[in-house]
Amino acid sequence: EVACASLVTILLMPRSGGAMYTTIKTYSKLAKVSVRGLSEEDTVIVSTLDYTTEDHTLFAPLWAGVPDESHAVHMIGRALSDASRFYRPYGVPACPSLTQPEAETVSQSVHLLWNLFVCEGLLRYGFRTDAAKLFAHNMTAVIQSLKLNRAFHARYHAERGTGIGERNALSGLAPVGLFLKILGVEILSPTRVKLEGENPFPWDVTIQFKGLKVIRGQKKTEVVFANGKSVTVEGGESAVVEV
């Protein structure tokens, strides 16, 4: 019986290896749980879902642009950048507050898709450097996995960077599109490129596409088109370069 506002009787049918029952309704609290028909050798385990645990989905509002600027800064500074909460050397883990060893492959998993959402949220609020830092953490895990195991993995360990789950899963591939967004480069066509902000990475980046070459430096960007024409853009102002 589950005692709350009403009583629900749990009937366990004996079988080899035990039995399991999940209540149909949800309850705000339990006054009593009783199971009848057990022998002295039987063991009963009662478990509930913990909705108070923080997980990476809490950053979805950043991606959707829901909070105002001050609230977003608060979320980024006090949660995303806090080592006691979500900040880890290889990315944002799924449920960092769960520290039990048996839950590690789930709680400490870095899901690249959810980290992508976080990065896009950072970009939305102007935190390009923070997005670049998080992306670099993710890529360190991806590169390490390729070097050690010659494979991508579905997820990566937030503390160690080791691969978790299925080998060569699509969800573990390096997000090239996200890299270009953080870099501030959008190739509209072989003759048209949109530039935004400055290169947040500590190295120059060269991109080649159908005869087009974009050399993204720290303070300037050179765009070389297939016909040989070259255009240099200084600073971090948004611009569309075309021929």
Which residues are covered by each model-predicted region?
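Short, glycine-/Ser/Thr-/acidic-enriched flexible segments
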Residues: 40, 66-69, 228, 238
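C-terminal capping/lid segments that line or modulate ligand- or cofactor-binding pockets
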Residues: 50-78, 104-220
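Feature 926 captures the class I aminoacyl-tRNA synthetase adenylation module centered on the KMSKS loop
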Residues: 222-224
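Active-site-adjacent bridging/hinge elements
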Residues: 35, 88-97, 149-153
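Active-site-adjacent structural elements in folded domains
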Residues: 44-48, 89-108, 160-163
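Beta-sandwich interaction modules
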Residues: 3-42
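Extended ligand-binding clefts on enzyme/binding-domain cores
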Residues: 19-30, 46-93
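C-terminal beta-strand-rich structural cap/linker in extracellular carbohydrate-active enzymes
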Residues: 29-32, 226-243
